[in-house]
């Protein structure tokens, strides 16, 4: 009964550390637009906007609710490197722009450490950047051996990747294909069959099945 919304930091960097502003945050509201009374502000984050669920993201791209553990997962663009896949976590901070997630500014100058205690740690980082875009937690019959894995598309890398993970622990990554159909913008799973559909920047829709 909740709606999760992501907001990029619009090139403003440290604004993602300001919980009184929306850029660089994850927002949680009810479907009727009301604010959940168990959001961070009503717990121990008194200075946060009441609708903010988490701060410190840069440019979120894909987001999905896992049908296996009922958690929210997302992909996020770093700068020059530092894309990541991770879990949206209540009242936590992914660290942008205190952390660089392994990447640098586009000028090549350093940003900050990849991660340090006190901040949310992503499940998987990519350096150099793959320009991670959409994602889903796969559930279906067509590729039942993938159930519970994250399927992540990319723009620059033009790939479809499968991430196996448990909790917040990365297990392995497999590139399903790369450079075959162009920049992949979106991914959807047909619920009744588990067949995968991919949308490219060229406006083409591709179907992936056995």
At which residue positions do the language-model features occur?
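Generic structural signal for coil-to-beta-strand starts
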Residues: 1-4, 70-71, 149, 194-195
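Beta-propeller domain segments
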Residues: 9-174, 182, 210
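Blade-level signature of beta-propeller repeat domains, shared across WD40, Kelch, NHL, RCC1
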Residues: 186-210
């Amino acid at each position: 009964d909740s709606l999760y919304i992501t907001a990029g930091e619009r090139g403003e960097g440290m604004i993602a550390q300001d919980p009184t502003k929306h850029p660089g945050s994850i927002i949680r509201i009810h479907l009727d637009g009301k604010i959940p009374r168990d959001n961070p502000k009503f717990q121990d984050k008194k200075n946060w906007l009441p609708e903010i669920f988490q701060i410190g993201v840069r440019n979120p791209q894909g987001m999905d609710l896992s049908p296996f553990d009922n958690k929210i997962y997302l992909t996020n663009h770093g700068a020059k490197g530092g894309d990541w896949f991770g879990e949206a976590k209540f009242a936590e901070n992914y660290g942008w722009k205190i952390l660089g997630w392994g990447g640098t500014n586009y000028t090549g100058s350093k940003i900050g450490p990849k991660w340090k205690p006190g901040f949310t740690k992503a499940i998987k980082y990519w350096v150099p950047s793959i320009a991670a875009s959409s994602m889903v937690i796969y559930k279906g019959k067509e590729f039942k051996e993938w159930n519970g894995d994250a399927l992540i598309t990319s723009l620059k890398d033009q790939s479809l990747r499968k991430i196996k993970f448990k909790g917040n622990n990365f297990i392995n990554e497999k590139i399903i294909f790369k450079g075959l159909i162009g920049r992949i913008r979106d991914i959807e799973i047909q619920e009744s069959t588990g067949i995968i559909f991919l949308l490219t920047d060229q406006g083409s829709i591709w179907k992936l099945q056995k």
